[in-house]
Curated annotation (Swiss-Prot):
<protein>
    <recommendedName>
        <fullName>UPF0597 protein DvMF_1488</fullName>
    </recommendedName>
</protein>
<dbReference type="Pfam" id="PF03313">
    <property type="entry name" value="SDH_alpha"/>
</dbReference>
<dbReference type="InterPro" id="IPR021144">
    <property type="entry name" value="UPF0597"/>
</dbReference>
<comment type="similarity">
    <text>Belongs to the UPF0597 family.</text>
</comment>
<dbReference type="InterPro" id="IPR005130">
    <property type="entry name" value="Ser_deHydtase-like_asu"/>
</dbReference>
<dbReference type="GO" id="GO:0080146">
    <property type="term" value="F:L-cysteine desulfhydrase activity"/>
</dbReference>
<dbReference type="GO" id="GO:0019450">
    <property type="term" value="P:L-cysteine catabolic process to pyruvate"/>
</dbReference>
Length: 446
């Protein structure tokens, strides 16, 4: 497998939720071909892009939410060269202008069928100009741009729809031992990048532990664990790095892993203007895949090299699960995919064997397989925290328990067999669930 290609495409910084990020990128790309700001914007979105962008905070948008606002910001102030960080430089004036555009009804959206699960089409209009930009296949992949009906750009790579790039096809076929061995083979440059991702995500967790972002899941749980308030009420109150992260050596490590990982999701879902390292196209996947092993490495005194290999395994397991279940699915990938990756990484850091790590993955599947995705929002911090805690529990069971010796329901001790089950459940069994969730989101839950 092309390890470098996998990590270059699948593990990268992302600002805010990646679904409205893809929408903002499409709008920013289209806006490049207009001589002045658009008068109208129309979005055509896959059901999953619609679902995951409907209720989530937009970075730098002062608490405002949704795909339509993301598209307006992208069109008025986005930088397409920044990919999933297209909104990194938006200002308060930009937010006011974008809000005005949406409030006067100039931004509309619709769900379209028979498109890839990752599909965001932004149509921008002003007199004499109609520009359409399409992001498809991956959140940061601009597939096509049309200006007044003429194609001015079309992606040259072979990716189309939901087809898999070669490295993901390799992951789909891989045995668990292959993932373990590939993680062994990372070079020094990749190891540094993986460690940088851990630093990024722990820094975001620090913010969530110190301040009550969103539902304040991590902040509240962290306060309870510390027996006091870690809130930073003053912008000038500089705290030492790590001062708000609960001590991972304490008596209830699972609770500390849960609080810290949830805290990072609190910050991200609230729309903080701070990037995280993503995994498999999702920032929350990245938080779940990275933070539990990073905390464990700190607690157990593991070397940077050991942590880097564990993180590589976590991302590879996450990617392998997503290769089977799909990029965006009715299942919560933070739990099923990234939780499995984190569990495998924790076993590796504890000097466990590949067989024990494979057991841990199966135990995560058995625990959280039924968790649904009802769109990105503040409540994702609850699911991310649960996934992190279950990853810890699964690792402990795999290291110290008897393990699974045969199938438990539709989960097998064999990694590939379980992935086949997950793929079928996701694509067939949960298809109606997605339809129902989107109908409820369109109608509005009171």
């Amino acid at each position: 497998m092309d390890i470098a290609a996998f990590f270059a495409a699948e593990v990268k910084p992302a600002l805010g939720c990646t679904e409205p990020g893809a929408v903002a990128l499409a709008a920013a790309t289209a806006a490049r071909h207009l001589p002045a700001p658009p008068e109208r914007i129309h979005l055509r979105l896959s059901a999953n892009i619609y679902k995951n962008g409907q209720s989530v905070g937009i970075p730098g948008a002062q608490g405002l939410r949704g795909n339509m606002l993301a598209s307006a910001l992208g069109a008025l102030a986005g930088d397409a060269d920044m990919g999933l960080q297209a909104l990194a430089a938006v200002t308060a004036d930009d937010v006011a202008a974008a809000r005005a555009l949406t409030e006067r009804g100039a931004v509309t959206q619709e769900i379209v069928q028979d498109v890839p699960t990752v599909y965001a089409e932004a149509e921008l209009y002003r007199p004499g100009h109609l520009v359409v930009a399409v992001v498809a296949g991956r959140h940061d992949r601009v597939a096509e741009v049309r200006h007044n009906g003429q194609v001015v750009y079309r992606a040259e790579d072979a990716l189309g729809g939901d087809s898999l790039p070669p490295y993901m096809a390799d992951l789909q076929r891989a045995a668990f031992g292959d993932l373990w061995n590939w993680a062994d083979g990372i070079d020094a440059d990749l190891a540094r990048d993986l460690l940088r991702g851990a630093e990024m995500n722990l820094a975001v967790a620090e913010q969530g532990l110190a301040n009550p972002w969103g539902l304040a899941v991590g902040h509240t749980l962290g306060m309870a664990l510390r027996g006091g308030d870690c809130r930073n009420d003053s912008a000038s109150d500089a705290r030492a790095p790590g001062s708000c992260v609960p001590d991972a050596c304490g008596p209830d490590i699972s609770a500390r892993v849960k609080a810290t990982t949830a805290a990072a999701a609190d910050v991200r879902m609230a729309g903080a203007n701070q990037p995280v390292m993503s995994s498999a196209g999702s920032g929350n996947h990245g938080l779940t895949a990275i933070i539990p092993p990073a905390l464990a490495a700190r607690a157990w005194g593991r070397s940077d090299a050991e942590l880097a290999r564990a993180l590589a395994l976590s991302h590879l397991v996450t990617g392998a699960v997503k290769a089977r279940t799909g990029r965006l699915t009715p299942l919560c990938g933070c739990a099923v995919a990234a939780g499995a990756g984190a569990a495998a990484a924790l076993v590796r850091l504890a000097d466990g064997t590949p067989a024990q790590a494979e057991q841990a993955v199966a135990l995560v599947f058995s625990s959280v397989m039924g968790m649904i995705c009802d769109g990105a929002k503040g409540g994702c911090a609850l699911k991310v925290g649960t996934a992190a805690a279950e990853a810890w529990s699964a690792a402990q069971l795999a290291l110290h328990g008897p393990g699974m010796t045969g199938a438990e329901g539709i989960v097998s001790p064999d990694f590939r067999a379980s992935l086949r089950s997950l793929g079928e459940v996701s694509s067939l069994g949960f298809a109606a669930v997605d339809v129902a969730i989107i109908r409820l989101l369109e109608r509005g839950v009171q």
